[in-house]
UniProtKB/Swiss-Prot annotation:
This is Large ribosomal subunit protein eL13y. GO terms for molecular function: structural constituent of ribosome. PANTHER family: 60S RIBOSOMAL PROTEIN L13, LARGE RIBOSOMAL SUBUNIT PROTEIN EL13Y-RELATED. It comes from Brassica napus (Rape). The keyword Ribosomal protein applies.
Length: 206
């Protein structure tokens, strides 16, 4: 290297031009995807284009557990509470996940309500036009039925109203950080302290 020139930092192979990724098919690919979506919508009519109904779940881990999103499927417990047989659920556009567990009553109740709302709005077409079975929708409902495009029953994230309060001297006197640190320490030493207390009790009995 000589003179006051820029030091090159391009780490290319000898024939790097042969491996350049091009995107000339992007507009055609966009059209193909659009046509495929339209064909699928026609094929699955009158079912919604967005696919089966999914539950509202909380994300995993400390980072995401405050956020709600759509899950894989409803639990057997939720279906039972909503009065929907597990074998019927997939046939009427409700996804099922036998592995998911309900860990809170609030989550269970919200998903049961979601199922009930869906069931109330549901229009069920008979398998054969001439043989109408119990549970199928009326001819009038069938005539007015339309295919739902895009998202249906979207998750509405409610903004919690915040109440402004004036800081009191009592509030200022409490150090929240110190309190959390103390409780963490207590939790960490709980086992050792319990063992020490048990050993001391044994010594006293001797």
């Amino acid at each position: 290297m000589k003179h006051n020139n820029v030091i090159p930092n391009g780490h290319f192979k000898k024939h790097w031009q042969n491996y350049v990724k091009t995107w000339f098919n992007q507009p055609a690919r966009k059209t193909r995807r659009r046509v495929a979506r339209q064909k699928k919508a026609v094929k699955i009519f009158p079912r919604p284009t967005a696919g089966p109904l999914r539950p509202v779940v909380h994300g995993q881990t400390l980072k995401y557990n405050m956020k709600v999103r759509t899950g894989k499927g409803f639990t057997l417990e939720e279906l039972k509470a909503a009065g929907i047989p597990k074998k019927l659920a997939p046939t009427i556009g409700i996804s099922l996940d036998h592995r998911r567990k309900n860990r809170s009553l609030e989550g269970l109740q919200s998903n049961v309500q979601r199922l009930k709302t869906y069931k109330a709005k549901l229009v069920i077409f008979p398998r054969r036009a001439r043989k109408v079975k119990a549970g199928d929708s009326t001819a009038e409902e069938l005539a007015n039925a339309t295919q739902v495009q895009g998202d249906y029953m979207p998750i509405v994230r409610e903004k919690q109203a915040m109440e402004l309060v004036k800081l009191t001297s009592e509030m200022k006197s409490v150090n929240a950080y110190d309190k959390i640190r103390l409780e963490r320490t207590n939790k960490r030493h709980a086992g050792a302290r319990a063992k020490r207390a048990a050993d001391a009790e044994k010594e006293e009995k001797k």
